[in-house]
Amino acid sequence: MEALLQLKGIDKAFPGVKALSGAALNVYPGRVMALVGENGAGKSTMMKVLTGIYTRDAGTLLWLGKETTFTGPKSSQEAGIGIIHQELNLIPQLTIAENIFLGREFVNRFGKIDWKTMYAEADKLLAKLNLRFKSDKLVGDLSIGDQQMVEIAKVLSFESKVIIMDEPTDALTDTETESLFRVIRELKSQGRGIVYISHRMKEIFEICDDVTVFRDGQFIAEREVASLTEDSLIEMMVGRKLEDQYPHLDKAPGDIRLKVDNLCGPGVNDVSFTLRKGEILGVSGLMGAGRTELMKVLYGALPRTSGYVTLDGHEVVTRSPQDGLANGIVYISEDRKRDGLVLGMSVKENMSLTALRYFSRAGGSLKHADEQQAVSDFIRLFNVKTPSMEQAIGLLSGGNQQKVAIARGLMTRPKVLILDEPTRGVDVGAKKEIYQLINQFKADGLSIILVSSEMPEVLGMSDRIIVMHEGHLSGEFTREQATQEVLMAAAVGKLNRVNQE
């Protein structure tokens, strides 16, 4: 079968680092090509070379059989290549229709925008994705998941021959993911080619026909998905076997450290639970169940309307994140790029940002040598892959950014560490490293709350699990009681709470 798109022998270097070396990718009509590899393997760089954001140093690009060079995203888009970015590329103050057709508005014979046609066409695209809202709604009023669906609708509007999807389901619910898969199958039937970049093995084996593996900027293999198992694919990605994906540390927790009684706040209703020293408490539930809201109320990022929180036997009131930090509660956000990191600042500045009081003299000046030593220690401990601590954090891979975000929390010497989706957008190798770090924190007596949408992660890492449903606690289970079926039943509100001390 002749490929719609072919990249061969692609090289791309930046000062001090070779990002791609002999990389290759084929996209076939009517087939979905998965592109996989650890963070930093070169997937994003390859997409930027393909769409003309970066100029390749060597190699050829064949588009519809002809050697081509795209001068930028506009030229690749006009040629028929659409891309759905992992980072949202929308303007919150504009409506959905205005975002979808920005720069391509429908105009009438008088040269004025034909709003009626524009909204009607946008509504058709939303209906294709099974979305329940109209296109006259402001994008800023939508959830992150709904905004991602608008991003997908925008790319569909170009009727591209090849569509690149970069982690398209990261912020989607199961229902939204199924709607996306339905659209992908429809696009396949029309002879379109899809590049599907994802860390989610389940999705790759469900929706993809072929898979291309990158490792350290190099092309490793192209295979039919049906010829592989999850284990063999992971081994190709990381170059080694990953024994025991969720390395649970079997160590009995200590005394109660955190006690939450009848906590209420935005999206949180009458929630009570405890957390012990050296314990990992998993928090499960569907999107919109109130898990993140509960953590933000606890930390002080959302207002508490009633209820009590005691830490080491003393009542604490957190009216702001500063109160949370001052009391030893650290929250690592699920959206590290929006809430967790300052992308234009360096690794060092990001890591020490909330712990500057430990490096300050009486007059307010910084003890730079102490700061650098602490950052250097954490970079080594966390195995952060960066050319130097002065590197802008926005240039690091997702897994390394997440390690810096966690390190920053630990620099404040917390008693309770809240990790909200700590491995979202992180490759399998970096996930394993993060799990090992979590176990290390547990061994040191830190109390950890692990919020995750990945049930195997919650089941594999937690000592005890609580489940949220519509702002309430719908279940509490020991490690032995918990199964995927039990957690899902509690997540949809079909199971009465089980509480075993």
UniProtKB/Swiss-Prot annotation:
GO biological process, one term: D-ribose transmembrane transport
Keyword Lipid metabolism: no
Example of a GO MF term: D-ribose transmembrane transporter activity
Protein's UniProt keywords contain DNA repair: no
Assembly with partners or alone: The complex is composed of an ATP-binding protein (RbsA), two transmembrane proteins (RbsC) and a solute-binding protein (RbsB).
Family classification: Belongs to the ABC transporter superfamily. Ribose importer (TC 3.A.1.2.1) family.
Biological role: Part of the ABC transporter complex RbsABC involved in ribose import. Responsible for energy coupling to the transport system.
Alphabetized NCBIfam families for the sequence: PRK10762.1
Protein name: Ribose import ATP-binding protein RbsA
Taxonomic lineage of the native organism: Bacteria, Pseudomonadati, Pseudomonadota, Gammaproteobacteria, Enterobacterales
Gene: rbsA
